Amino acid sequence: MYRIPRGDISPARRFIDNKQEGVYPVMAKESVWTKLRRKVDKEFAEELQRQQEMERTAREEAKALEKQQKKEAAIAAYREKRDLTVADFFRIADLPLPDDFADIADHTISDFTADPRRLTPDSIFLYWGKSPISAGDPASVLQMAIDSGCLCVISIQPCTHPHTLLLPDTTDALEGTNRIREAYIKASAYIRSLHKAKVITVTGSVGKTSTKEMIEAVLRQHYKNPLISKGNNNSMFSITRNIQSLKRTTNVYLQEVGAFAPKTIEYSARQLAADIAVYTNIGVSHIESYGSQEALTADKLSLSTFGKPDGLAIINYDDPILMGHSFTQQVITYSLKNPQAMYYAKDILRADDGYTFTLACRAAAEEHPAQIHVLGEHNILNAIVAFAVGRALQLPDAEILAGIASYQPSGMRQNLLQAGKYRILADCYNSSLLAVDNTLKVLDELRLPDETKRIVVLGDVLALGDLSEETHREIGRVCTQHKMDLLIGYGIAIRYAIEEAAAAGMQAHYYADRAEMEAAVRAAVRPGDIVLFKASHGVNLGASMDKLFGTDLNESSAIGHKQFRIEVHGDFEFYIFENSASLKTYLGHDAVVEVPAFVTATVTDELHETEVTRDLPVEKIGKTAFRGNEEIREVVLPETVVRIRDGAFQGSGLESLDAPDSLLSIGARAFADCPHLTTVNLPEATDQLGDAVTENSPQAMIMYR
């Protein structure tokens, strides 16, 4: 039955009432009810959604506020502990605060250092007879501190700085404990303790830096801003500087640690409190200072002894000395090929630019295909330990393997590069018997045309003490097992290696004079040949490499590691190196400038350990030599210059340059942005031009004479 209700109520209300009574109007009215219900449901749902969204927003805002408050509280707590006043530093370092320091006691310090070159007006300087420039006499070191205007000086020697704490009797005769050095270590260890960053250390007689760089390649796949020690900056002084650069947000800190003299690694270990200590091997490097391999080993093991008790020691299973010692931390082993180690390689195949191999993890019964794009099987070992470190940090396997594959050597460590018509294998930052053998293996593996000569230039392995002659003779015998057409030796003890090689029938020649060695290389090398340079850093073989082939590796490294002095001679400011000078900046205002060929300076001959006065050839025109100098129109370069570095004349008023016959290379943008430049006249020998050499110099033409 259908009934249309009457009465003084709305049609919608009557419709709903009828439905509840089971009385329905005509079918056309059904759509009215449906539309109304939809409207009500939609409004209800929208209101519910708005309320839920408001509640969710309120919760998120409250959560964000709480997170921000916690972050601000954490930052405040961190800054309260990290921002040290002078009084705080003396308390942490366990030193007495002199009464006459009252006026600076509440002054916030920027840093503390033993390097007077790095002092600022807010620094504290500590001097106990050792510093990164300890070759200088104490008076000059302390004068640098005074001139810096630093806050105060803590010194073993009298000092005229107005705020000086003099501790002349600083060494305990029985314990050998130096109070100032101990203060330095304690303050550094305190700052380390404020940070949650995982600390990874790398030490060993050979391969520290290349291993560190392989691990770095892995870390950079995962972490945005890991703190990594630069180059081979591995002394306690560099470590203290790095520790002070730690941030609250730093996740991981990778530090190479070097051995120099008894207890130097122990001092570093106490500062670092390593979570992971990586050991490459134990050889005889620096044994001259330690007296025995046992003493050297004991010092290296201190990285674990003073590391975190729940940390890891990752050791080379192939090194019998390491395997013969016990460690205070849990031990992880790695090997090139030994399946008894926890990590090792198998199925190694040579590729065009490196190797493919299977990385096996014995404990987890896993295998991973891996590759590296660098020659030398020892780099596979570096990749294996980098994988072990990544696993210890619980990084994804894909990221670890990608990091290993991305590694490329640089600088003066097994760096294969093209220098004009020649190929160079630069590996002269450090050396040892094992390192020489490894590098010669890389040279063996290079696929070269039959007519290409392999020329090897070797220098001394330093700091061997009584083992020097026998080690160098063994190096000579090792050379006979490798591919080379000519062996050239420069240095002192390297003559023993040349004697052994020559006795075996090799073409081998020894030179005690650097200029004679350079002349021999120049006479022997032909376009297409490859030349290997290998020596301890103190031999400074890289300087000869730069001079002979116009490379920039040695000078860039020296500047980066602050291994130079700056001197002003007339209108010229020079970088002073051991064997050469480089024009840093022209200070004058002349339109026509003639650069001197030589600079007389006193330098340290590291190989012979003497101070000498030399006429240093000006071999490089530096990056800021004439940059932005709009007054110059003509520059005359001497016949000693072999390289014009990046940007040397950029943005200058130079009109033309007639380069000397000695010039071999020009860096990137060297003559860019020079509106008046018309010609750069080059000799045929200049066969290395960087990118964009004359960019934005509209009239400039490069011409060969």
Language-model features, listed with the residues they occupy:
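Acidic, Mg2+-coordinating active-site environments of NTP-dependent enzymes
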Residues: 96, 122, 155, 159-163, ...
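ATP-dependent carboxylate/acyl-activation modules
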Residues: 76-77, 202, 411-415, 440, ...
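Phosphate-binding loop of NTP-binding sites
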Residues: 43-48, 176-317, 321-330, 390, ...
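Active-site beta-alpha connecting loops in nucleotide-dependent enzymes
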Residues: 129-138, 142, 410, 428-506
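Structural signature of tandem-repeat unit edges
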Residues: 1, 10, 24-25, 571, ...
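Short beta-strand/loop segment at the start of cytosolic alpha/beta domains
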Residues: 561-586
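N-terminal leader/targeting and accessory segments in enzymes
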Residues: 27-186, 477-478, 482-492
